[in-house]
C-alpha cells in the first residue's frame, strides 16, 4: 500500500497481471494434497484440526492463491437431506410468485434462497444440526476469523442455460460502486477482506460444463481491486485468464472475499447446479443478512439436548456469539467485561440439561434485555 486513498487511476492491469501470473508452490503448503490451476486442494477427511493446519489455511487465503478446495468436506447423505429441504423451499417460493434476485446476475436467471440459514433451521432442525456440525467448516472459519464468527447462507441454483456472473469481489466493499468504494481509505480496503470468509458447498456433482465458479488466484493481493473490477479491461482479463475447477457433491470451496470470482455459465442440459453459498462474518463485523437467531436456537434446542454430533459447531453456526451491541442498562456485564452471549446460554442449557420451557424462557428474556 503506497497511497492513503485509491482512485480509478491507480488501477493498472499490469500490476494485477504481475500478481496473478505467479505460480502456487505446493511445497509451501505441506498439508495440501494437490495444486490444480494454481488452486490448493486439501483432503478434508484427513486434514486434522491443528493450529499448524489453521495457520496454513489462513496463509493460503491471505498471502497464497486466496482460495482452497476442501474435498469431501461434507458427507453426501447429509448434503442430500439439506438439498431436499432447499428444493422444497424453492418450490414454495415459486408457488408464491417470489422471484429471487442476484447481486451479479440477471434477476430470475437462477433460483435463490435468501436467509437460507434460519429457514433451514426452522424447517428441519435435525438436518440443520447434522449439516452445520461439520468440523471442516468450523476449522476454516476459525482459522480465518477466530471465535465468535457468524454464519449466513444463501442457496443458489443455476439452471441449465443460466449465464455467468460478472467478475467481482465480495462483501463489504465488493457490494459498492466504484465511486462508493473510493470514499474509503486504502487501509479499509485491506481491512474489508479479513472481516468475512466466503465459501460454497457443492450440493451436486459439478463438472466444468455445469459452470462451477470462476476464480482468478492471487487476485486478492491487488490493492485497488475493489475499484478495478468495475473496469472493462479488468473484466476482459478475468474472462481470458480465470480458473474453473470441477467439484464433487460435498466438496467445499473457501476463498478470500477480495478474490476476483463469479459463477460460471451452466452449459449442461439437465443439471440444476446447486451450491450453498456461505458468508461467514467476523464477530467484529456484521453480516449482510439479518437472521432470527433466537428463533433458530429455540427450534434447535430440543435436537441439541440429545445430539451426538458436535454441539459446539452447531451453536457456532446458529447462535449469536458476540455480546455486543446490547442495552447495557438492562443487560449488564455481571462478573465480567461483557454479558453472556446467546451461544453461551445455549451451551450452558445443554450442559445443565434444562427443560425446553426453561430454556425458551431464558432465551427470550436474554433477547429482551438486548433491546
Where are these regions (language model features)?
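Active-site environment of non-heme Fe oxygenases that use a 2-His-1-carboxylate facial triad
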Residues: 3, 7, 44, 49, ...
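Charged, cofactor-coupling segments
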Residues: 281-308, 315-329, 366-370
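Fe(II)/2-oxoglutarate
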Residues: 1-63, 314-325, 329-371
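Non-heme Fe(II)-dependent double-stranded beta-helix
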Residues: 10, 23-67, 71-178
